[in-house]
Swiss-Prot record:
One of its GO terms (molecular function) is alpha,alpha-trehalase activity. It catalyses: alpha,alpha-trehalose + H2O = alpha-D-glucose + beta-D-glucose. This is Periplasmic trehalase. The lineage of its organism: Bacteria, Pseudomonadati, Pseudomonadota, Gammaproteobacteria, Enterobacterales. Substrate binds at residues 159, 166-167, 203, 212-214, 284-286, 317, 518.
Length: 570
């Protein structure tokens, strides 16, 4: 039986068959014009809308261990025809749903297990993985949920067969470190293409990810490319930077104090900040059954509200974390859309500063001043509303209760990362992180053990890099060294035992991959590879780079992070 809260997706099939058929024709033409983002195409529909009750029934039948499998399956013919056949056959005696799926869909192939050559150092292993993780989808099948991209790209690994937005920046750090500037340029071009095609960078290049974005790292990507190409990169991608900013700020002009619209929030004092948001409020196709179960566990809340908050947490990249929940042990208390995240607003500060720099490079001083003013206003709002003076760290703002939240998370390091923190406050954040988050194997995401993957005891490579670089920005080199050395030791010990790098690590010790979440631990792994290479160069002298973590801990970090040219330490 289809849950009432998603019945509209099913009824849509009956009510607008002609319109949907038109959408399918548009989708067919879309794949043929993938390299031309200027072509006027409608947004392709995700599989839960294309397949309606069939999608719901397959996912609820749990035919596959991973719900993402059927979301990524490719219809072998027109989905409307498959759906019509399903309606006719499903009530017949002896109907076999799995057989029907096997006949009518091409399931994603399991990736061949990569066996690295014996005796490789950590650096050699990572360098050998780049071609293994590289994909090209310039052309895709007509009804594939995969969205084509004009250039090749590097995927995270494991079950993740597509490109992901914020993952990619940390992967690109490693590509640059390995000298693959051509791949860095290709990936920036792909994200620029997505902005032109969809008005934003989606969570990933799948139709079911189009309704949301992820932490906005495109400005950092362009700044990274500018290290190699100079200001030409800034000037080339200025239009896309402006479009991404417009996406995050959509509706701000009409907001009154105390109002919110999609991704933008205006507080009672007129301060403008942002939140995570997904345009849809139904179960995620890639986690269909899990989301329905979460909703059923809390019948006192509107289902659509929970669905949107689950989706918005996926947009945050932290899916899931006690950070978004009223009760850390109950996922259905999630309320991402009523929380103003400190890391998101730090990243948008960086976007504003990059827009100012790019505008200046293009000779538009007026625009540069405009974006600088927006960045300064955001910085003041961060200091005013996202600083917990009682606790002594940056935190998220609670729109529901109109107050700063008390929880310390690794997101507190983001204002340091973008050079937006006051120096005295940066010192307090460093002390808090060292006292409450630093563990033997690196920096814990939070201090809460909820069973969710973005909580203790897990540590994630991107947050280690944000912390290490942010701490160095403010002269907190000792704490930066602790984070760097402990995490690298964890990565090295795991690699020595298992000959792989993984998505996340248990930082309560060293040598163990992380747990929790909706799927098994994944290896590969794009952002861990990138951060590991960058950190190896932090602990080893530039004149004598190391290929593995040294047996003896260095006295200090050997290199300083690349300062963001558009931001200055306060």
């Amino acid at each position: 039986m289809i849950p009432p809260e998603i019945r509209r997706s099913v009824l849509l099939q009956k009510a607008i068959k002609l319109a949907l058929a038109g959408t399918l024709l548009t989708f067919a033409s879309f794949s043929a014009t993938a390299a031309d983002p200027s072509s006027d195409t409608e947004t392709p529909q995700p599989p839960d809308i294309l397949l309606g009750p069939l999608f719901n029934d397959v996912q609820n039948a749990k035919l596959f261990p991973d719900q993402k499998t059927f979301a990524d399956a490719i219809p072998n013919s027109d989905p409307l025809m498959i759906l019509a056949d399903y309606r006719m056959q499903r009530n017949q005696s002896g109907f076999d749903l799995r057989h029907f799926v096997d006949v009518n869909f091409t399931l994603p192939k399991a990736g061949e297990k990569y066996v690295p050559p014996a005796g490789q150092s950590l650096r050699e292993h990572i360098d050998g993985l780049w071609p293994v993780l590289t994909r090209s989808t310039k052309n895709v099948e007509k009804w594939d949920s995969l969205l084509p991209l004009p250039e090749s790209y590097v995927v995270p690994g494991g079950r993740f067969r597509e490109i992901y937005y914020w993952d990619s920046y940390f992967t690109m750090l490693g590509l640059a470190e390995s000298g693959h500037w051509d791949k860095v340029a290709d990936m920036v071009a792909n994200f620029g293409y997505e902005i032109d095609a969809w008005g934003h960078i989606p969570n990933g290049n799948r139709t079911y990810y189009l309704s949301r974005s992820q932490p906005p790292f495109f400005a950092f990507m362009v700044e990274l490319l500018a290290q190699h190409e100079g200001d030409d990169a800034l000037k080339e991608y200025l239009p896309q930077l402006q479009k991404e900013y417009a996406y995050w700020m959509e509706g701000v002009e009409t907001l009154q104090p105390g109002q919110q619209n999609q991704r933008v929030v205006k507080l009672e004092d007129g301060s403008v900040l942002n939140r995570y948001w997904d345009d849809r409020d139904t179960p995620r196709p890639e986690s269909w059954v899990e989301d329905i179960a979460t909703v059923k566990s809390n019948p006192n809340r509107p289902a659509t509200e929970i669905y949107r908050d689950l989706r918005s947490a996926a947009a945050s990249g932290w899916d899931f974390s006690s950070r978004w929940m009223d009760n850390p042990q109950q996922l259905s208390t999630i309320r991402t859309t009523t929380i103003v995240p400190v890391d998101l607003n730090a990243l948008l500060y960086q976007l504003e500063k990059t827009l100012a720099r790019a505008s200046a490079a293009a000779g538009d001083r007026a625009k540069a001043s405009h974006y600088d003013a927006l960045a300064n206003a955001r910085q003041k709002a961060i200091e005013m509303h996202l600083w917990n003076n009682k606790e002594g760290w940056y935190a998220d703002y609670d729109l529901k209760n109109n107050k700063i939240r008390d929880q310390l998370t690794a997101a507190a390091l983001f204002p340091l990362y973008v050079n937006a923190a006051a120096k005295d406050r940066a010192a307090k954040v460093a002390a808090a992180a060292q006292a409450h988050l630093l563990q033997p194997g690196g920096l814990a995401t939070t201090s809460v053990k909820s069973g969710q993957q973005w909580d203790a005891p897990n540590g994630w490579a991107p947050l280690q890099w944000v912390a290490a670089e942010g701490l160095q920005n403010y002269g907190q080199d000792d704490v930066a060294m602790e984070v760097t050395w402990r995490f690298l030791t964890n990565v090295q010990h795991t690699y020595d035992r298992e000959k792989k790098l993984v998505e996340k690590y248990d930082v309560s010790s060293t040598g163990t991959g992380g747990g929790g979440g909706e799927y098994p631990l994944q290896d590969g792994f794009g952002w861990t590879n990138g951060v590991t290479l960058k950190m190896l160069d932090l602990i080893c002298p530039q004149e004598k780079p190391c290929d593995s973590v040294p047996s003896t801990r260095p006295a200090s970090l050997s290199a300083t992070p690349t300062k963001t040219p558009s931001a200055a330490t306060q």
